[in-house]
Amino acid sequence: MSTPANPEDPWARLRQFTRARIAIGRTGHAQKTASILAFGLAHAQARDAVHLALDVAALDVALRDAGLDALHVLHAHGAAADRDQYLRRPDLGRSLDAESRARLVPSPQPYDVVFVIADGLSALAAQRHAVPLLQAVLARLHDWRVGPVVVARQSRVALGDEIGERLCARQVVMLIG
């Protein structure tokens, strides 16, 4: 067993495996200033991320550049009219708006899987990570009947149920921020 870089800090070795705030320490009865400031910054970034809109046009370009446009990309929207309503009324993010219901028509043959890229509470996370993850997963689904990729705004996880039902999908994979 190796000795930690700082023998006074037994947690140093474990911190390399996580960005979580573990064993942040104290000075007297208070937390260290650096950890308080780091938490404040992370909290502000999270609050900003919640209000960011999903850049659907950029996501469409990323899907095309990754060679995934052959899957056919559909756009959907939760029932919330805007981001403020989405945040105040989680129930509206769990169902499609009328226009999206009309756009998502059933397939004559069921799909094995449909992928949904959804903004959730962090559109930035979906924007950054969904396409590479989708590429990696699709590379292993050779014999699967893969349905269209659905890009959904103002979406909660449960929106995948309605999307899967409307598109006749056996499974839905939600890539949600």
Residue ranges, per PLM feature:
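Single, functionally critical "micro-switch" positions that shape active/binding sites
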Residues: A118, I176-G177
